Amino acid sequence: MQSSLKPAGSGVLQLLVCFLLLYSRPSSCSDINAHDGQGQVGSEQLWTFQGLVASVFQYLQLLFHHIVPQGMFWTDDIAYELMTKKVEHLSRLHPQYPCRKEGKVVSPIATTGVRGKQEEKLRLLSPQKSPAVKVNRDRCFTTKVIPKATKQEVTHPSKGFFGPFPTVGLNLVAD
């Protein structure tokens, strides 16, 4: 019989972290050399630990902004508050993000596709005009707290993609 030294769910967590690291890497996966495992990118593109953590938390924040409105949310506020505090702390550490609104730190949304490239070209062509400010505001989003669900919604959630979890409405304590 073979014993496992890892907790039961650690494989999924390791896979998620690995995916996030590869997804947030500044170069593509093809830049990794199979012989020594080192990337072939210049030293100016290497991630610092805080930069890597910041990009992972920003990706998670963006992910949470997509899943929370669909009815998936934390039953306790501890995990949400911890993630929000960490993202705000990292935003203060990395002031290169130009998006600030009414004293709140907001994170930029990465623009992709033709529209993002067109907006970037517009800013380069006419940096003195006001559309640059409009583009910056359009590229930012704020962290807002979604109101907690009523007790009835927690105990009897509406039919969704995953269906009700067996632990919904219960307070779980880790060993």
UniProtKB/Swiss-Prot annotation:
Keywords recorded for this protein, A-Z: Cytoplasmic vesicle, Endoplasmic reticulum, Golgi apparatus, Signal
SMART domains referenced in this protein's UniProt entry, alphabetically: RESP18
Pfam families: RESP18
Top-rank taxon, per record: Eukaryota
GO BP: in utero embryonic development
Location within or outside the cell: Endoplasmic reticulum; Golgi apparatus; Cytoplasmic vesicle, Secretory vesicle lumen
Tissue: Pituitary, hypothalamus and pancreas. Found in alpha, beta and delta cells in the pancreatic islets.
Positions in coiled-coil regions: none
Signal peptide positions (record): 1-29
Listed GO CC annotations: endoplasmic reticulum; Golgi apparatus; perikaryon; rough endoplasmic reticulum lumen; secretory granule
Record-stated family: Belongs to the RESP18 family.
Role summary: May play an important regulatory role in corticotrophs.
Record-given protein name: Regulated endocrine-specific protein 18
Gene expressing this chain: Resp18
